[in-house]
């Protein structure tokens, strides 16, 4: 027994004035309606539907795609502006974060992680004031190097932040570290009570 799959002739071919929606078109219309409630795709849906019943005239066949193209171009321009704005902000942030080597280009995620670390470092510099004369305020703030994992020789390994390590490599003291970090930003170090 052989079956032939016949494709029915669409109602829109036989009766162009009658608008029947298939199940897929109905589902698409429902999802488009939910998109419209968020202000999304309004022009695309309007172009696809054509003029409303109260418009009194029909749009020419070429007007719909032109509207869609203009809207797409406008959306692309907005996205380019947004991307350029984000990239400009990252460039500005990169100039504020000290890196080694100085000319190192950071990725966006590296920039965010290093900025977060640098903010924590500066907070430790501000909180400890002159109490951390060894140039490692983050080491001092972290509990003096107590770690759950002992070093191979039985001593506790020292945890140190990137910026304290950089200062240590340069041979600077706490005063150099705090002064340089804060002077670059135009902020004077806080003088807290000595312990």
Swiss-Prot record:
SMART domains: HLH (SM00353). The keyword DNA-binding applies. InterPro entries: bHLH_dom, E-box_TF_Regulators, HLH_DNA-bd_sf. Changing residue 75 to N: Does not affect formation of a heterodimer with TCF3 and ability to bind DNA. Pfam families: HLH. Keywords: Activator, Developmental protein, Differentiation, DNA-binding, Nucleus, Phosphoprotein, Transcription, Transcription regulation. Heterodimer; efficient DNA binding requires dimerization with another bHLH protein, such as TCF3/E12. Interacts with MEOX2. Early transcription factor that plays a key role in somitogenesis, paraxial mesoderm development and regulation of stem cell pluripotency. Essential for the mesenchymal to epithelial transition associated with somite formation. Required for somite morphogenesis, thereby regulating patterning of the axial skeleton and skeletal muscles. Required for proper localization of somite epithelium markers during the mesenchymal to epithelial transition. Also plays a key role in regulation of stem cell pluripotency. This is Transcription factor 15. The lineage of its organism: Eukaryota, Metazoa, Chordata, Craniata, Vertebrata.
